[in-house]
Amino acid sequence: DPIDPLAPCVGPYFLYGTLMDPSLLSEILALPEKPRLRPAKLTGYSLKLWGQYPALVDGATGEVVEGMAYDVESEQHAEKLAAYETRAYRSAPCRIRFMDGGEPGDISGTTFQYAGNPMDITEGKFDLGVWLRRMGRDGAGNQ
């Protein structure tokens, strides 16, 4: 079968923002158990804000964005993540560097980059804890 270039990618994803919350990720993907996330980072990117949500954009050469890596095992899961991220984001290839000392130390993967109007993003920091409290999700999956 020819590979569909528009098919969602499976494999390692670099997640940042709301998707770093294990309970939210479990909900979106309807996972039977808590997802295994590895602390990770991307180099050469920057996080801005799109409204209350973080927006990953190209950054300076040495700029680092920290997040979590998650292994997406099915196209259905990749599609659910893309739907959650909306059309304001597009999946893009990236080089994920792990921060937990485990192997492999880095790997090729996928992330969601902001694809909306650059005029709509602002400088600012996204705080997952504050967002979870605002959404009434505080501590929902942190036991």
Q: Predicted segments — roles?
A:
Residues 1-143:
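Glycine-aromatic micro-motifs
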